[in-house]
Swiss-Prot record:
It comes from Caulobacter vibrioides (strain NA1000 / CB15N). Pfam families: KH_2, MMR_HSR1. It comes from the Bacteria. This is GTPase Era. Residues 64-67 are annotated as: G3. Residues 17-24 are annotated as: G1. One of its GO terms (cellular component) is plasma membrane. GO terms for molecular function: GTP binding; GTPase activity; ribosomal small subunit binding; small ribosomal subunit rRNA binding. InterPro entries: G_ERA_dom (IPR030388), GTP-bd (IPR006073), GTPase_Era-like (IPR005662), KH_dom-like_a/b (IPR015946), KH_dom_type_2 (IPR004044), KH_sf_prok-type (IPR009019), P-loop_NTPase (IPR027417), Small_GTP-bd (IPR005225). Residues 140-143 are annotated as: G4. It is a peripheral membrane protein. Monomer. Residues 169-171 are annotated as: G5. Belongs to the TRAFAC class TrmE-Era-EngA-EngB-Septin-like GTPase superfamily. Era GTPase family.
Length: 316
């Protein structure tokens, strides 16, 4: 870790936005390594994940926050509160907007998901107005959209009075991300780096392992399984030969969901385990022995222990 303060900069930048706006993809892109899980499901990020990006002598700690939406369940309320809290504590905040969903909503051609996304964007704008805050706007998913159209949308957003700067980016291809990163660099205060140079994320290994497996669950059964599953790492043992033994339990709410996760002849669970094990071997840079179990626990999302494990407030 660097210990000089004369030339180095370091600080926090929060990425907020509606579910599925592309926040995790953007953080992974800026860090240059996998920090947050990315699936076709919205609301896959359940707690703020810190990714560490380095640009020259500047270290930016990127806080990938849960999507901000209209919450119903206790877990949803805790996720939204965590998102706003992550933004309030940062030196810079980027509001990431799915411009494809915004345009579809304006043209009355939106899918239900796109319509909800546009509504959630307005909820965020109202929250920023109430807090009297100005943040950076990043219009994401600009691929294939005419520049004149993008400029018109950007003006509409800028006129709300809550944005200091506007960037047009594609988190998936990297277009425009360099300019956004340069802006964040300029906003970081002088000071020593907050993390070692080779650290890309602030996430305990047990929790990282659970997140990787949860991603594989949703990638495999995203159409059949609603947001009724979580993964707990019940054992994480570093062995003398340098390998690690990990035991995890996939919790679902109903027996029918357990059957889906296991699959015919156990093939779905086998795929999840193999995909998760391969990625964990790559991330941890060691051999991984992964053992998965699937358990029905009807009210897992209402357990206080789950909230404390992932840093969320149970009493919301």
């Amino acid at each position: 870790m660097t210990d000089t303060t004369s030339k180095t900069r370091a600080g926090f930048a929060a990425i907020i936005g509606a579910p599925n706006a592309g926040k995790s993809t953007l953080v992974n892109r800026m860090v240059g390594a996998k920090v947050s899980i990315v699936t076709q499901k919205v609301q896959t990020t359940r707690f703020p994940v810190r990714g560490v990006a380095i640009e020259g002598d500047t270290q930016i700690v990127l806080v990938d926050t849960p999507g901000i939406f209209s919450p119903r369940r206790r877990l949803d309320r805790a996720m939204v509160r965590a998102a706003w809290a992550g933004s309030e504590e940062a030196e810079a905040t980027v509001h990431l907007v799915d411009v494809q969903a915004e345009l579809a909503s304006r043209a009355d051609k939106a899918t239900p998901g796109e319509y909800r996304s546009a509504q959630d964007v307005q909820t965020i704008i109202e929250g920023l107005k109430a807090a009297d805050r100005k943040v950076i706007l990043a219009l994401n998913k600009i691929d294939g959209i005419k520049r004149d159209t993008l400029l018109a949308v950007a003006k509409d957003f800028f006129d709300t009075g809550v944005y200091s700067d506007v960037f047009m980016i594609s988190a998936s291809t990297g277009a425009g991300v360099e300019d956004l990163t340069a802006k964040l660099v300029s906003m970081m205060p002088e000071g020593p780096w907050l993390y070692p140079e080779d650290q890309t994320a602030d996430l305990p290994a047990r929790l990282l392992a659970a997140e990787i497996t949860r991603e594989k669950v949703y990638l495999r059964v995203h159409e059949e399984l609603p947001y009724a599953a979580t993964v707990e790492t019940t054992a994480f043992e570093e062995r003398k030969d340098g390998s690690v033994r990990i035991e995890q339990t996939i919790l679902v709410e109903r027996e029918g969901q357990r059957v889906i996760v296991i699959g015919k002849g156990g093939q779905t669970l086998k795929w999840i385990g193999q995909a998760s094990r391969e990625e964990l071997c790559d991330i941890l840079d060691r051999k991984v022995h992964l053992f998965l179990h699937v358990k029905v626990k009807e009210n897992w999302a209402e357990e206080r222990g789950l909230f404390s494990d992932i840093g969320l407030d149970f009493d919301v």
